[in-house]
From Swiss-Prot:
Subunit (UniProt): Component of the 40S small ribosomal subunit.
Taxonomic lineage of the native organism: Eukaryota, Metazoa, Ecdysozoa, Arthropoda, Hexapoda
The species this protein was found in: Anopheles gambiae
Protein name: Small ribosomal subunit protein eS26
Sequence segments annotated as region (Disordered): 86-115
Location(s) in or outside the cell: Cytoplasm, Cytosol; Cytoplasm; Rough endoplasmic reticulum
């Protein structure tokens, strides 16, 4: 039978069994290596209220904390919510992950720490 993907849609090479995780969207059990993972960094406070809170803050250089969440999606939810797209036969062979884009404030913080 023909094979659609070299890895069979998984990352479990010579492992036998991998524990399951729950999809954050539909709660379906998905093997951890097959689940599509997305790491999300968000401000706890919404963008409209950031300025009000920083003005009301007693501390001048107080940085608002962020929410860090690792989301696990099953394949169908990841396609439906446009986290991933189905690709043509030629582009399916490209195994390098796409270029990651980071929030602008995160890049500024990393540059400040290096200096």
């Amino acid at each position: 039978m023909t094979k659609k993907r070299r890895n069979g849609g998984r990352c479990k090479h010579n492992r036998g069994h991998v524990k399951a995780v729950r999809c954050t969207n539909c709660a379906r059990c998905v093997p951890k290596d097959k689940a599509i993972k997305k790491f999300v960094i968000r401000n706890i406070v919404e963008a409209a209220a950031v300025r009000d809170i920083s003005d009301a803050s007693v501390y001048s250089s107080y940085v608002l904390p962020k929410l860090y969440a690792k989301l696990h999606y099953c394949v169908s939810c990841a396609i439906h919510s446009k986290v991933v797209r189905n690709r043509s036969k030629e582009t399916r062979r490209i195994r390098t992950p796409p270029q990651r884009s980071f929030p602008k404030d995160m890049n500024r913080q990393q540059n400040a720490q290096r200096k």
